[in-house]
Amino acid sequence: MKNLDINTFDNIEDIPLGSSEQDPYDFFTLSDRNVMNSDMKKNIVQWNSRYSYNQLKNKDSLIMFLVEIFRSLFVSNCIDKNIDNVLLSIEEMFIDHYYNPQHSRLKYLIDDVGIFFTKLPITKAFHTYNKKYRITKRLYAPPTFNEVRHILNLAQILSLEEGLDLLTFDADETLYPDGHDFNDEVLASYISCLLKKMNIAIVTAASYNNDAEKYQKRLENLLKYFSKHNIKDGSYKNFYVMGGESNYLFKCNEEATLYSVPENEWRHYKKFVDYDTVQEILNISEKCLEKVIKDFGLCAQIQRKEKSIGLVPNKIPSLNIKNEQKNYMIKYEVLEEAVIRIKKEIIKNKITAPYCAFNGGQDLWVDVGNKAEGLLILQKLLKIQKKKCCHIGDQFLHSGNDFPTRFCSLTLWVSNPQETKACLKSIMHLNIKSFIPEVLYENQ
């Protein structure tokens, strides 16, 4: 940990705060003006509102693009011979996109590709992964979607040589199983260790208004670990929780409990959305969800909160009852259908306020605000550049609420807390000379 180089900015002037000009997309004004302009902010809004069949499972465009390249090499039986030349070409495209994200060749080939805030060493990442799993020696099983996802994660981790100032996490399926509370001492130890070197935030869709106790309950075991290891050195001050995507901010005090941060300390970094617009988004969503329940005969209910609305099963499935009926479960494809219907209606009503309609796997939620806005608030509050911020999450498809963070942060796409631990272990040991990235395949 001693060698993890974390740089901070002494003055707010060190980071330009973007244009003061107001436009319909000003909630995406970023901390370094030279990376994102108004057209790119508009592009984020358009992709946040995109709806198509292609957003279904494992349809990430960049990963599928690489899968097809590797698969063509595999089919032609020349992956072992030609892989270096192919990786060099891919890396050149990545570098071109890093310098010119709006007009790169990669952008023309993959129109929804995110922004690269670091140069991705895909060649080194592939060979690291191949050294352990020997992809190039396989005869009948071509590289898969998840393998390419892991390789891109490795490339992103290997690009962090300058260190990080802010590490953010999704909650469910990233830090703990969906619907559960945090309960992993090893993961807590990794987060605690990194907290001594950087700011860490959990950016979650969970919306309990400003009720710090409810967030405290979900994270109780993590905060207990902080009470033993992060109070004396004051590193507990580096921990944040952003609830409701971007609507409620909490910090940790010296008793390792959460408290609500006064709005006057951070609300000016957030786009103002008036009450009528909030209600319009929720009303449109509620009408769509009522129609979905009727059309598909769902055993589900609508839950409406201050700035969010959700479709949840009437009963959560039990893992212990084998013969229990499962007809109350909502099919993944039905949730996707509902997300697309809601986005379509919001677009028709020409609403430009930040929002997020996402498929949670077992339920669906629509929030006023989104994780991109949540990350941008933290970046501005802490005066941190986007290339020094990394978000770890499991919902990076177009219908997932982590997707917008690709336009304002580095990202690592995990599928479970075990993969999160592997990523953190690699980040902790990144600048050690004998460092070998932790490679964790999905089924291990």
From Swiss-Prot:
Principal location class: cytoplasm
Documented activity regulation: At physiological pH, allosterically activated by ATP. ATP binding is a prerequisite to magnesium and substrate binding. ATP binds to 2 of the subunits in the homotetramer inducing a closure of these 2 subunits and the release of the C-terminal loop, thereby activating the enzyme. In this conformation, the enzyme can bind IMP and magnesium which ultimately leads to the release of ATP. At pH 5, ATP does not have an allosteric role and is dispensable for magnesium and substrate binding. Inhibited by phosphocholine and D-myo-inositol-4-phosphate.
Residues that bind IMP: D170, D172, D178, T204, S207, S308, D363, K371
Cellular component per GO, a single term: cytoplasm
SUPFAM superfamilies on file: HAD-like
GO biological process: IMP catabolic process; inosine salvage; nicotinamide riboside biosynthetic process; nicotinic acid riboside biosynthetic process
Alphabetical keyword list: Allosteric enzyme, ATP-binding, Cytoplasm, Hydrolase, Magnesium, Metal-binding, Nucleotide metabolism, Nucleotide-binding
pH dependence as annotated: Optimum pH is 4-5.
Top-level enzyme category: hydrolase
Mutation effect (H398V): 4.7-fold reduction in affinity for IMP and 1.4-fold decrease in catalytic efficiency at pH 5. 6-fold increase in affinity for IMP and 7-fold increase in catalytic efficiency at pH 8. Increases catalytic activity in presence of ATP
Result after altering D170N: Loss of catalytic activity towards IMP
Binding positions (Mg(2+)): D170, D172, D394
Impact noted for substituting D172A: Loss of catalytic activity towards IMP. 1.2-fold increase in affinity for pNPP and 8.6-fold increase in catalytic efficiency at pH 8
Effect upon mutating F403Y: Increases catalytic activity
Binding positions for ATP per the UniProt entry: K132, H150
Homology family: Belongs to the ISN1 family.
Oligomeric form and interacting partners: Homotetramer.
PANTHER family hit by this protein: IMP-SPECIFIC 5'-NUCLEOTIDASE 1
Protein name, as recorded: IMP-specific 5'-nucleotidase 1
Native source organism of the sequence: Plasmodium falciparum (isolate 3D7)
